[in-house]
C-alpha cells in the first residue's frame, strides 16, 4: 500500500516562482492550490495561468478567492490604475534598492492567513509560497524574518496540529529558480510574471526584466511571448 502523502496548500499566483513551488509540492506532497484575485491589473491572466499550472501538475483542487480590500485601499500600481506601472530602472543593479510602487501593502499576510485557514480544514501540514529575497524588487514581505514571524503566529493562533510555512526559493537567485524549474519539469510555458495585462508580456517592467535576465543567466529560453526582449 502506498503511504498517504502529506497535504500541502500552495499559494499559486500563476507566476514563475509559484510555478516552481507548485512543481516541488507536486513532487513531495498531495498538493492543493489557492489563488487570489485582488483587483490586480493582470487578474484574469493570472487566473488562467494558475489554473493551467495546477491542472498540468495534477493538483487535487484549486481554491479561487476574490479579495476586494486591496483595490479599495489602493496605494499600489498593481491595484490602482491611477498609478502607472514603471519601467525597470536603466541600471538593473538599481532594482530592489527601494520599495517600488508595485508593492501591495501587507499582501502576503492576507494570502497566508487564507491559506492557513484552508490548511486547517484540509488537514494540510504545509503552506508553500514562492517568496524570493534574492534578485527581487525589494518587497518587505519577501524576507525570511517575515515568514519566521508568521510561523510563530500560526503556532499561536491555530488549533492543535502542525502547519508549517515553507519558502523553498527564498534564498535562491532567479537563475537558480529557472534551472530548478527546468529540472523539475515545471510548466514555465504556462506562467505569467508581467505587471501588464496585455496579450504579450511587456518585457520592460521590473518583473519582466528580472525574469528575462534569469533565463539568460541560466542559458535557457523563456517560453512566453514578449513585446520587447
Curated annotation (Swiss-Prot):
Gene3D superfamilies: HUPs
Reaction(s) catalysed (UniProt annotation): 7-carboxy-7-deazaguanine + NH4(+) + ATP = 7-cyano-7-deazaguanine + ADP + phosphate + H2O + H(+)
Domain of life: Bacteria
Binding-site residues for Zn(2+), renumbered to this chain: 194, 202, 205, 208
Function: Catalyzes the ATP-dependent conversion of 7-carboxy-7-deazaguanine (CDG) to 7-cyano-7-deazaguanine (preQ(0)).
Family matches, as NCBIfam families: 7-cyano-7-deazaguanine synthase QueC
Protein name: 7-cyano-7-deazaguanine synthase
Top-level taxonomy: Bacteria, Pseudomonadati, Acidobacteriota, Terriglobia, Terriglobales
Gene giving rise to this polypeptide: queC
Amino acid at each position: 500500500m502506498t503511504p498517504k502523502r502529506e497535504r500541502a496548500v500552495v499559494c499559486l499566483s500563476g507566476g514563475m516562482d509559484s510555478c516552481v513551488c507548485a512543481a516541488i509540492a507536486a513532487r513531495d506532497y498531495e498538493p492543493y492550490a489557492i489563488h487570489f484575485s485582488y483587483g490586480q491589473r493582470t487578474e484574469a491572466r493570472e487566473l488562467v495561468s494558475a489554473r493551467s499550472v495546477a491542472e498540468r501538475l495534477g493538483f487535487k483542487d484549486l481554491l479561487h478567492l476574490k479579495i476586494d480590500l486591496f483595490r479599495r485601499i489602493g496605494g499600489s500600481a498593481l491595484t490602482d490604475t491611477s498609478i502607472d506601472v514603471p519601467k525597470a530602472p536603466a541600471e538593473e543593479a538599481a532594482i530592489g534598492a527601494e520599495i517600488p510602487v508595485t508593492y501591495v501593502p501587507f499582501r502576503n499576510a492576507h494570502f497566508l492567513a487564507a491559506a492557513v485557514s484552508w490548511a486547517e480544514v484540509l488537514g494540510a501540514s504545509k503552506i508553500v509560497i514562492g517568496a524570493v529575497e534574492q534578485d527581487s524588487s525589494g518587497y518587505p514581505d519577501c524576507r525570511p524574518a517575515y515568514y519566521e514571524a508568521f510561523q510563530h503566529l500560526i503556532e499561536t493562533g491555530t488549533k492543535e496540529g502542525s502547519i508549517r510555512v515553507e519558502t523553498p526559493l527564498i534564498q535562491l537567485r532567479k537563475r537558480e529558480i529557472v534551472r530548478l524549474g527546468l529540472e523539475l519539469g515545471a510548466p514555465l510555458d504556462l506562467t505569467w510574471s508581467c505587471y501588464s495585462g496585455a496579450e504579450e508580456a511587456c518585457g520592460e517592467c521590473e518583473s519582466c526584466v528580472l525574469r528575462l535576465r534569469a533565463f539568460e543567466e541560466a542559458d535557457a529560453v523563456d517560453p512566453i511571448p514578449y513585446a520587447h526582449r
